[in-house]
């Protein structure tokens, strides 16, 4: 994670580019492989990460443009979480890492958004790319999944692009770190590409490097020898 002030500065910059209403950033949920507790490697939504920074499932972020406040919705660690993973930080502790003071349980999100809709407030969101997120937004906002792209906020999309296309020094530093990792992955693959070596061996080594030095690859490795 970056410094907490960076995330609050990003949210402040987004407010300055937007009009009024509420910006809704749904985080990603775990995706099961073959039963609920056996999940694929978790990947947080990039926009949620950019503005709220927490790489954890089952969270949602709100930026209230009219009140100038930020809210993080998420549940406290369960007893199962503590048994399997040991002591876990509270929602307040997690939120403090990204300069958010207002935290609420995920069960309160539906009422919060419903009250905003009934008050005539605009809810800004970007088009979802995952089916589970589309279903969640559909239920929360009362919009059929097929119409979510129609109701998605073009104003928000343009504002996010305007912010994210300009990289600050700390972002460039992180990008350069990942360039070094990518270089190691590619040069390792080149050295291994010899007669008798099969693709899965090279693939496995490349994936291992990605997880050793970072958080895995941003897209599946494309490899042919």
Which residues are covered by each model-predicted region?
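A composition/biophysics-driven feature that prefers long, compositionally simple stretches
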Residues: 1-184
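Active-site cores enriched in adjacent His and Asp/Glu residues with nearby glycine-rich loops
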Residues: 19-36, 176-225
């Amino acid at each position: 994670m970056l410094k907490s002030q960076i995330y609050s500065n990003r949210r402040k910059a987004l407010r300055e580019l937007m009009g009024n209403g509420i910006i809704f950033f749904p985080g990603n949920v775990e995706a099961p492989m073959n039963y609920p507790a056996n999940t694929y490697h978790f990947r947080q939504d990039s926009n949620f990460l950019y503005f709220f920074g927490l790489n954890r499932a089952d969270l949602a972020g709100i930026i209230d443009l009219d009140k100038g406040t930020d809210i993080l919705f998420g549940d406290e660690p369960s007893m199962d979480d503590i048994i399997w993973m040991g002591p876990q930080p509270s929602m307040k502790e997690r939120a403090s890492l990204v300069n958010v003071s207002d935290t609420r349980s995920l069960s309160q999100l539906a009422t919060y958004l419903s009250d905003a809709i009934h008050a005539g407030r605009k809810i800004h969101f970007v088009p979802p790319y995952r089916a589970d997120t589309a279903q969640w937004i559909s239920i929360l906002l009362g919009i059929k999944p097929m119409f979510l792209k129609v109701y998605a906020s073009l104003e928000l999309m343009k504002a996010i692009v305007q912010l994210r296309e300009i990289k600050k020094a700390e972002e460039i530093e992180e990008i350069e770190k990942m360039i070094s990792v990518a270089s190691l992955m590619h040069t390792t693959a080149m050295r291994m590409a010899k007669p008798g070596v099969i693709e899965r061996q090279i693939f496995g080594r490349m994936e291992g490097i990605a997880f050793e030095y970072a958080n895995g690859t941003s897209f599946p490795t494309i490899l042919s020898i």
